[in-house]
Curated annotation (Swiss-Prot):
Pathway: Cell wall biogenesis; peptidoglycan biosynthesis
Protein name per UniProt: UDP-N-acetylenolpyruvoylglucosamine reductase
Cellular component GO terms, alphabetical: cytosol
Organism (species): Zymomonas mobilis subsp. mobilis (strain ATCC 31821 / ZM4 / CP4)
Principal EC category: oxidoreductase
Keywords linked to the UniProt accession: Cell cycle, Cell division, Cell shape, Cell wall biogenesis/degradation, Cytoplasm, FAD, Flavoprotein, NADP, Oxidoreductase, Peptidoglycan synthesis
Keyword 4Fe-4S belongs to the record: no
Length: 310
């Protein structure tokens, strides 16, 4: 345990074998590098530790999960309650019979695709182009380059808010475009994926193509949260944003990327409010021009500061 004293923690939260930090800065844990602190940041030792913690914690205590922070805005006022962040101990991949890969809940899609290539397993190449850990990828049915999670997932192990450990088959998640019925209180600790035998050289060539295309078309080396808005049915969000005159639009140090209009950037000193306000301005302009309401793909969590517009 760090930051808070043991007595202070024990009066508020049950003990764990992992780590608990009070008033923990969250900005360094997100790709935008903005936002306030978590009241409590909890890193469980393993699935059983997480389950035991959730069984003992006050049911009224708010609990949320944070992955690698690639598709989220933490608001400037911080987050009340507990933020669960699975540590590196949950990042692993192993091959199982039947051309399957099992991985831990904090494993990056990039890592899974690399292991799949090393094992000459195909159909997982698209993960190479998606920033994020597996829990968030499952929740939003992440996809790119012709693939998505729903096409390869077999089952998922999750821990519920009451501490129950459950295994859900893919059918129970009722996947749709950028959507799943994974419960809001669920924390993914393991996932099992189905690969297919393939040619290692072809798999690696496809992954290299994905990397090159992503580098050429997206601001991957900037402080960004990935795709900001979902594509409305029949449209591409970036085209609507571009045609509404939003490419390069700025609020404070937040900017609509000139490289890909569906990406928002922190140019250096943006606040979470700057970024969220910019996103809302984009939504307003697209609505005014096309009558289409863009739906946020990026999650926004936490409290706004007094006076914030967003």
């Amino acid at each position: 345990m760090t930051t808070a004293t043991s007595s202070n923690i024990s009066s508020k939260l049950p003990s764990i074998r992992g780590e608990i930090e009070a008033n923990a800065p969250l900005a360094p844990l997100t790709w935008f590098r903005v936002g306030g602190n978590a009241e409590w940041l909890v890193s469980p030792y393993d699935t059983e530790d997480l389950s035991d913690f959730l069984k003992k914690i006050d049911p009224s205590m708010p609990v949320r999960v944070l992955g690698i922070g690639s598709n989220v805005i933490i608001r400037d006022g911080g987050v009340s309650g507990v933020i669960i962040r699975l540590p590196r101990r949950f990042s692993w991949v192993k091959r199982e019979e039947g051309n399957r890969l099992r991985c831990g809940g904090s494993t990056l899609g990039m890592m899974i695709s690399k292991v799949a290539a090393a094992e000459s397993l195909t159909n997982l190449e698209f993960m190479r182009g998606i920033p994020g850990s597996i829990g968030g990828m499952i929740r939003m049915n992440a996809g790119a380059y012709g693939g998505d999670i729903s096409k390869i997932l077999i089952q998922v192990t999750l821990v519920r808010r009451n501490g129950d450990i459950e295994i859900w088959p893919v059918e129970k998640l009722n996947f749709a475009y950028r959507y799943s019925e994974l419960p809001e209180d669920a924390i993914v600790t393991e996932a099992l994926f189905q690969g297919q035998p393939g040619d290692k050289d072809k798999i690696e060539a496809q992954m290299n193509k994905i990397i090159a295309e992503r580098e050429a078309s997206q601001p991957v080396r900037s402080r960004t949260g990935g795709s900001t808005f979902k594509n409305p049915e029949g449209y591409k969000a970036w085209e609507l944003i571009d045609e509404a005159g939003c490419r390069g639009l700025k609020i404070g140090d937040a900017e609509v990327s000139t490289k890909h209009a569906n990406f928002l950037l922190n140019l250096g000193d943006a606040t979470a409010a700057d970024i969220e306000n910019l996103g809302e301005e984009v939504r307003a302009r697209v609505k005014a021009k096309f009558g289409i309401t863009l739906e946020w793909e990026i999650k926004r969590i936490g409290h706004k500061l007094d006076g914030d517009k967003a």
